[in-house]
Amino acid sequence: VWNDYINGKTIMAVIIHTPEEIEKMRELGKLVAEALDYIGDFVKPGITTNELDKLVYDYHVNVQGGYPAPLHYGNPPYPKSCCTSVNHVICHGIPDDKPLKEGDIINIDLTIKKDGFHGDSSRMFTVGKVSPQAQRLIDVTHESMMAGIAAVKVGATLGDIGYACQNVAENAGYSVVQEFCGHGIGRDFHCEPQILHYGRKGQGMVLKAGMIFTIEPMINQGKRHLRILDDGWTVVTKDRKLSAQWEHEVLVTETGCEILTISPRTGKA
């Protein structure tokens, strides 16, 4: 989601979820993780992202009994059911008829809406065999996300999360996208707090039990600078070098945090 801090927008109150809401969010987190397990099996050379998108729509609606939240979201209305960001696309890549090819890397970002709640997660997938450089970017980006998640606990700050993500990425020689960030989630697709993937320890909002938000660092192989294409959605690296992203939904608990979007198939984050 767009980083509103850059634009000086007024930040609204953060929701502390009730036990009943938390249980629903666990259900939705499991659903979106199941959908990512499902769609990953189809990521192979020759398939188009449009074909993947149709599979996502069918799975969310006909198998899971929900609805793809990205479809018709925002302004201009997003035209598809998921985001498919290939190679130098940072985020919000719109599915199209171009076949994936051997060596591509792709982020698939899914959000399901059901019973008034949302589940949101994304993963990186490799198309056939990829270069060691591409695999390293994918691995470091996952490590960056997990470092951010490890910083989540009652009394920690948003700056602690951002610092942890940034530290991993920059120590590996990569850059962190600053214009887009994680977000609160629940009955709303996007709400407070905004989770920056860069920052200073001890700064920003203090975390409380019952908060639910995404941590989803976008890490570039080259410089952090980006541009948005004329479709109003697709975000690409300005230098056309590779970008990677992982996303999990996290609940702040009294004892630390709980990842709500772990893969049911592998049991891994």
Where are these regions (language model features)?
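Active-site neighborhoods and metal-handling regions in enzymes and metal-associated proteins
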Residues: 2-269
